Amino acid sequence: DIVLTQSPASLAVSLGQRATISCRASESVDNSGISFMNWFQQKPGQPPKLLIYAASNQGSGVPARFSGSGSGTDFSLNIHPMEEDDTAMYFCQQSKEVPWTFGGGTKLEIK
């Protein structure tokens, strides 16, 4: 299975500043020029919401302050400017190989 290592495990960011979350895969999640890396946001009591798919594409209705980048094994999610509503858990997920696997999560809070 592909192992995803997220960092940091927790992060506190001031309103209006930038939050950066990293995800490293144990092997490349690229195939045919596509990076099969996705990012999800989860709030307590709610199902995960897709933010970013294929490394850098925004999900439907996702605000422009969320962006993703990376390829191969190294990826990042950026949130800028940070808003109060962005307090949540964030997870990377690879969909290159079954079983699809998730990172351990990052808890994002307001500083």
Curated annotation (Swiss-Prot):
CDD domains: IgV_L_kappa (cd04980). Keywords: Adaptive immunity, Bence-Jones protein, Disulfide bond, Immunity, Immunoglobulin. Residues 1-23 are annotated as: Framework-1. GO terms for biological process: adaptive immune response; immune response. Residues 54-60 are annotated as: Complementarity-determining-2. The keyword Hydrolase does not apply. Residues 61-92 are annotated as: Framework-3. Residues 93-101 are annotated as: Complementarity-determining-3. Residues 39-53 are annotated as: Framework-2. One of its GO terms (cellular component) is immunoglobulin complex. Disulfide bonds join C23-C92. This is a Bence-Jones protein. This is Ig kappa chain V-III region MOPC 70. It comes from Mus musculus (Mouse).
